[in-house]
């Protein structure tokens, strides 16, 4: 207990925790760990929950070999494959989310990146959405250069999403068609272009607890202010189809430690919420203060109205 309180004090003072301290926290008393992670969240952020939503704007046929992903051409899955959606379809979904009180909306596209005519089309999409709607715009278009990121910002995008997925040490066990450094460079490019950055990862890929802590520390070093935590949904046909799902306690411990290491960030529940009781009710009591709501890329999420009810029932509020 004394150790957890000491770590809480360091976190509130924004003193960086070490990986050894992170590991000790992970293995500490669950009830006290969750309680103090929640107290850090309350003291720094209050009781507001940030909601975001996404649309799978271009699906499948991805040339990268990410072991977890249903959209990779290296995997045989039953997902829908289609090119970039037309503007009216995307606008309709964005407007529905805005009307429901969601704060942010992102177009997500499959592939290493988005190039040429498709990229220019999506720039037009963002520009039009920015003029016609009030919802904050985010973008997720893979590995990208600074020049293209500046174009996104000029079109009205406020935040770029690009996950690191796991630790630097474990990354080549998950993907070999591009490097960890390319992902880090994309994040740095986005920040240099004046964009906010959303970056997190996936837990349950076969990584160690130290890999998760290393990821949390890397995100802290990059000063990421929105950190989505996905829990692997093992999809049939992918390389990780036989991975055993994480149990709720391990997920909650991970969320709590991420809160200690990244006290000023939004810790955002993302994919795999269905593995948690009531789509993550306890996670919001373990330091999380944001969530993706609605459907995800190739899996179903929680309905917006149900998330709003959940948040209200636990005594928190939507920003």
From Swiss-Prot:
SUPFAM superfamilies reported in the protein's UniProt record: Radical SAM enzymes (SSF102114)
Residues holding [2Fe-2S] cluster: 106, 138, 198, 268
Annotated metabolic or biological route of this protein: Cofactor biosynthesis; biotin biosynthesis; biotin from 7,8-diaminononanoate: step 2/2
Any single GO BP term: biotin biosynthetic process
EC number(s) reported in the record: 2.8.1.6
Cofactor detail note: Binds 1 [4Fe-4S] cluster. The cluster is coordinated with 3 cysteines and an exchangeable S-adenosyl-L-methionine.
GO molecular function: 2 iron, 2 sulfur cluster binding; 4 iron, 4 sulfur cluster binding; biotin synthase activity; iron ion binding
Alphabetically ordered keywords of this record: 2Fe-2S, 4Fe-4S, Biotin biosynthesis, Iron, Iron-sulfur, Metal-binding, S-adenosyl-L-methionine, Transferase
Enzymatic reactions: (4R,5S)-dethiobiotin + (sulfur carrier)-SH + 2 reduced [2Fe-2S]-[ferredoxin] + 2 S-adenosyl-L-methionine = (sulfur carrier)-H + biotin + 2 5'-deoxyadenosine + 2 L-methionine + 2 oxidized [2Fe-2S]-[ferredoxin]
Sequence ranges assigned to domain Radical SAM core in this UniProt record: 44-273
Organism superkingdom: Bacteria
UniProt: [4Fe-4S] cluster binding residues: 62, 66, 69
Parts of the chain that traverse the membrane: none
SMART domains hit by this protein: BATS, Elp3
Cofactor (UniProt): [4Fe-4S] cluster; [2Fe-2S] cluster
Matching NCBIfam families: bioB
Subunit structure of this chain's protein: Homodimer.
Similarity comment: family membership: Belongs to the radical SAM superfamily. Biotin synthase family.
PANTHER family in UniProt: BIOTIN SYNTHASE, BIOTIN SYNTHASE, MITOCHONDRIAL
Protein's job: Catalyzes the conversion of dethiobiotin (DTB) to biotin by the insertion of a sulfur atom into dethiobiotin via a radical-based mechanism.
This protein's name: Biotin synthase
Protein's organism: Clostridium perfringens (strain 13 / Type A)
Lineage: Bacteria, Bacillati, Bacillota, Clostridia, Eubacteriales
Gene that this sequence comes from: bioB
């Amino acid at each position: 207990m004394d150790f957890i309180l000491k770590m809480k004090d360091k976190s509130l003072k924004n003193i960086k925790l070490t990986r050894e301290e992170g590991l000790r926290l992970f293995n500490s008393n669950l009830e006290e760990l969750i309680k103090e992670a929640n107290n850090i969240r309350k003291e720094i952020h209050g009781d507001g929950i940030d909601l975001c939503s996404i649309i799978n704007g271009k699906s499948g046929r991805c040339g990268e070999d990410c072991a977890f992903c249903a959209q990779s051409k290296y995997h045989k899955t039953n997902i829908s494959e289609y090119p970039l959606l037309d503007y009216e379809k995307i606008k309709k979904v964005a407007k529905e989310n805005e009307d429901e009180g969601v704060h942010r909306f992102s177009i997500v596209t499959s592939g290493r990146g988005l190039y040429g005519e498709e990229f220019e089309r999506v720039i037009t999409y963002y520009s039009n959405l920015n003029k016609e709607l009030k919802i904050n715009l985010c973008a997720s278009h893979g590995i990208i250069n600074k020049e293209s990121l500046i174009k996104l910002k000029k079109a009205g995008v406020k935040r770029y999403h690009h996950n690191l997925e796991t630790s630097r040490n474990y990354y080549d066990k998950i993907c070999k068609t591009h490097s960890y450094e390319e992902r880090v460079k994309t994040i740095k490019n986005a920040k240099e272009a004046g964009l906010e950055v959303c970056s997190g990862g996936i837990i349950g890929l076969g990584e160690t607890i130290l890999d998760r802590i290393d990821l949390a520390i890397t995100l802290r070093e990059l000063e990421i202010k929105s950190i989505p935590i996905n829990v692997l949904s093992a999809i049939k046909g992918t390389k990780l189809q036989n991975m055993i799902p994480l149990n709720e306690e391990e997920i909650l411990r991970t969320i709590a430690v991420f809160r200690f290491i990244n006290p000023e960030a939004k810790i955002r529940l993302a994919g795999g919420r269905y593995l948690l009781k009531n789509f993550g009710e306890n996670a919001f009591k373990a330091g999380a203060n944001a969530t993706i709501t609605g459907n995800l890329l190739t899996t179903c999420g929680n309905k917006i109205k149900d998330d709003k009810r959940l948040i209200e029932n636990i005594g928190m509020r939507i920003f």
